[in-house]
């Protein structure tokens, strides 16, 4: 499973990990994400991971995954009251911290007093990170997909530029308007484009974004529709992503989840996202025949 990850980027690792991915420039990032026949799948951790008692969207969660296998990550930038960009999914603090109320009603100084909770609701030692901290941690280790929450696009574009992170950060877009903003701001940007109908891809092509700067987020489960879209994307040399987080991750047993993950890969999908990336990565590496 790991061959494509290592062949498309430079690597720094010990015999048993960590499994770091380093992209020298944007061309290396494009090559990593490009579709090629027989390419092994890319594992993407959704908000890092929820495994090993670790809280989502924490630096510790990201690092844990890379100790086990190479992976990339989807994370969630969100604004504080005083306009600090943090990495945090929910609009409220209650589910994933020992705080309460809306994130936007708290300053960064106030949020630093809180601790993150894991998936079982247990308070951990880990703190909410800023996006700047995650950028600095990720450099030379992995690639980051930035979801869209409440941060203005210009602020996201500016912080990517400030940290010289264009060669390891991917912008997720759900509209041609957002894609146009990011592309005009930085023509070398890597995009993850989310759409569910084949005809919805055409407006992005009309923007002039090179297809080698795109991968496609096409759903949360496999179907005849995703098969159709994935086949179309392959024709452009574009990988397609399925997110198992809201679907297959919810299956009751590890065996059921493993079988579902394998079916996603067997359908031809070449990026798969999960709340449990280590479990998923091991499942698709150890295919049953």
Specify the residue positions occupied by each region the protein language model found.
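Bacterial N-terminal signal peptides
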Residues: 1-5
């Amino acid at each position: 499973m790991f061959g494509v990850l290592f062949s498309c980027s430079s690597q720094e690792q010990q015999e048993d990990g960590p499994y770091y991915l380093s992209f020298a420039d944007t061309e290396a990032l494009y090559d990593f994400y490009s579709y090629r026949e027989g390419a092994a799948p890319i594992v993407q951790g959704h908000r890092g991971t929820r495994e090993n008692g670790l809280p989502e969207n924490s630096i510790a969660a990201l690092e844990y995954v890379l100790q086990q296998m190479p992976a990339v990550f989807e994370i969630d930038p969100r604004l504080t009251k005083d306009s600090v960009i943090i990495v945090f999914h929910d609009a409220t603090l209650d589910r994933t911290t020992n705080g309460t109320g809306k994130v936007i009603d708290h300053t960064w100084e106030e949020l630093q007093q809180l601790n993150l909770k894991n998936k079982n609701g247990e308070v951990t030692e880990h703190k909410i990170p800023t996006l700047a901290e995650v950028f600095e941690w990720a450099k030379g280790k992995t690639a980051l997909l930035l979801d869209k929450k409440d941060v203005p696009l210009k602020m996201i574009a500016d912080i990517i530029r400030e940290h010289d992170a264009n060669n390891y950060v991917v912008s997720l877009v759900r509209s041609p308007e957002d894609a146009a903003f990011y592309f005009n701001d930085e023509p070398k940007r890597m995009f993850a484009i989310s759409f569910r109908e084949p005809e919805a891809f055409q407006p992005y092509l009309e923007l002039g974004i090179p297809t080698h700067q795109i991968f496609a987020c096409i759903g949360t489960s496999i179907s005849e529709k995703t098969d159709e879209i994935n086949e179309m994307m392959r024709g452009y040399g574009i990988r397609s992503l399925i997110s198992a987080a809201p679907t297959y991750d919810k299956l009751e047993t590890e065996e059921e989840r493993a079988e579902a993950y394998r079916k996603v890969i067997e359908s031809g999908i070449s990026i798969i996202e999960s709340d449990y990336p280590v479990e998923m990565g091991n499942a698709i590496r150890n295919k049953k025949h």
